[in-house]
Amino acid sequence: MSRPESLELRVIRQVVAEQHAQQPIDAADGARFIAYTDGSCLRNPDGPAGFAAVVRSEASDRVWELAGHLPSSTNNRAEWAGLTAALLFVPSPGHLLAFSDSQYIVQVALGQWKRKANLDLWQTWDELRRERAVDLELRWVRGHAADPGNERADELASLAALNFDHAAWIRTRAISEPARAVQRLQPLARGDWEGRFLRDVANRLQHGLRLSPRQQAVLDRIAQRGKDAE
């Protein structure tokens, strides 16, 4: 690539190389893989972030778990990193069926939504797609809906955002009641933006951060839908 690589891509390449060294893909694993990818940012935007990809071979059923820490990023950039890690990890040529709970990532990667932000990453994405002969199928999966692959990717991305501080991660798993109350509103979310908004708000409350008046107003509006439906 002619321009300097982004922080995200540098970390992705390191994580992929380490995983290949520790658990190499061999002939018995075939060329068809399934991946669940995710990203997490503790203080979106420009806060500590993490990405993850849980990759499984259709032939051998072996599973690889990739995760990386980003000192400063955003939710969407971390989500991109998770998907890109899966793309770079599987063999080329090969086939990858990838699941992401980010409508933004799925729709932009498939060309359904216009690219308005993170243009450096999407230019890199185009270059990587041309370089690698990977037949990619990309599907959206609802987050926090008890899908084991998605849940595991979420756990790894959250742990990576904390720079693999297991003690801190365990504390975040003990969800506070305010954060849990926001999580219960997820079925009321309309579109990917509101889904991401609710996850961000739950994350802020979990870490003891206050909401801005605008954030509180949006949260109240979403909660009112549930009351109106009662």
Annotate each PLM feature:
Residues 39-46, 83-155, 161, 165-166:
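RNase H catalytic domain
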Residues 167-230:
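A composition-driven surface/loop motif
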Residues 18-32, 155-185:
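Phosphate/pyrophosphate-recognition segments in soluble nucleotide-handling domains
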Residues 1-19:
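N-terminal secretory targeting signals
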Residues 14-16, 20-77, 81, 85-90:
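RNase H-like nuclease fold core
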